[in-house]
Amino acid sequence: MHAYVYKSQLKPDTYVYVPRRDDFSALPAPLLTSLGALTFVLDVALDAQRRLAQADPDKVRSDMSERGFYLQVPPSVASLMPRHYD
C-alpha cells in the first residue's frame, strides 16, 4: 500500500495520510475545514518492513483501507479525542 502524507497548516504536528495524491474526498468536511490548507510532505510505501516515527504502520494501513484516510495527531491531542477516532 502506498500513502501520500499532508501536513495541516492550522493544526501543529497534524498529518493526513491518503491512498491517492491530492484526493481528500474521504475526509469529512468538518475535519477538512478544521485542518485548513494541507501541504504535501511525503509519499511512502507502507510495506511490512516500514517503520514510521509517530504512527503504527498497521493502523495507518487499516484506517486507509476502511476509512480512506489516516489522521495523525500529536500524542497530547490524541489522548483528548473521542474513542471512535482511534
Curated annotation (Swiss-Prot):
Coiled coil: none annotated. It holds the Pfam family YcgL. Residues 1-85 form the YcgL domain. InterPro entries: YcgL-like_sf, YcgL_dom. This is YcgL domain-containing protein Smlt4554. The lineage of its organism: Bacteria, Pseudomonadati, Pseudomonadota, Gammaproteobacteria, Lysobacterales.
